[in-house]
């Protein structure tokens, strides 16, 4: 399984991804791009405010509260005691819950938009044995990604070469301290992302050194893509 590259040596990774340390040829890269699609996150559909309100009102708990409010109002009218406080309080709770739900959905949409800005990056790769700059959306699995100090990582990759490389991974791990990477590291057990020393991940930044890596996942298959998928499901 390609996802197990954490446990593979560099020659094994090269073999499994049908590539070389000198990169893919242009024709193979074009074929893989056509077969697997571009290296970008899916764009979530934005619902209208009216649809968001309707969706919040269709929540089971909200429906129960609305029924309770209706019963309270009916009782107040039927008994002619004129005490509508309980019903109004329930309606107020429903309104507050709906506003909070819509607000949280809006925050998720903004976070997803920020992630989608990563679609607009460029990347350095080795193709036909030559280093070249391409649109990051054109990256494919098996590409050799060139990473330099200050570069943003534009796809998940298994490192094959490192020189004093440190990566800032707070976007994924929440850890502010940069992680020193080692292309020769081979894991013997499952590790959290922050301890995967032979891997780099889309959306993280090189803060020192340089290196190269074989792209192992693009777009929604990356670790950052999984986050984008979760955010998209909440909008």
Question: What are these regions, as identified by a protein language model?
Answer:
Residues 3-235:
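Conserved cytosolic headpiece of P-type ATPases
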């Amino acid at each position: 399984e390609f996802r197990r590259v954490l446990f593979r040596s560099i020659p094994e990774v090269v073999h499994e991804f049908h590539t070389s340390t000198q990169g893919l040829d242009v024709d193979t890269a074009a074929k893989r791009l056509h077969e697997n699609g571009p290296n970008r996150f899916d764009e979530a559909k934005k619902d209208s405010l009216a649809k968001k309100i309707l969706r919040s009102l269709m929540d089971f708990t909200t429906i129960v509260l609305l029924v309770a409010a209706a019963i309270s109002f009916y009782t107040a009218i039927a008994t002619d005691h004129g005490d509508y406080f309980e019903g109004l309080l329930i309606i107020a709770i429903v309104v507050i819950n709906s506003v909070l739900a819509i607000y949280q959905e809006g925050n998720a949409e903004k976070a997803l938009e920020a992630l989608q800005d990563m679609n607009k990056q460029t990347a350095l790769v080795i193709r036909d044995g030559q280093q070249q700059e391409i649109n990051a959306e054109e990256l494919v699995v098996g590409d050799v990604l060139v990473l330099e100090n200050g570069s943003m990582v534009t796809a998940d990759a298994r490192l094959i070469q490192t020189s004093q490389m440190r990566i800032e991974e707070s976007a994924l791990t929440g850890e502010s301290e940069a992680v020193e990477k080692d292309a020769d590291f081979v894991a013997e057990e499952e590790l959290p992302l922050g301890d995967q020393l032979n891997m780099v991940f889309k959306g993280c930044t090189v803060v020192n050194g340089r290196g190269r890596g074989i792209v192992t996942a693009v777009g929604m298959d990356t670790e950052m893509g999984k986050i984008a998928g979760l955010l998209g499901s909440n909008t």
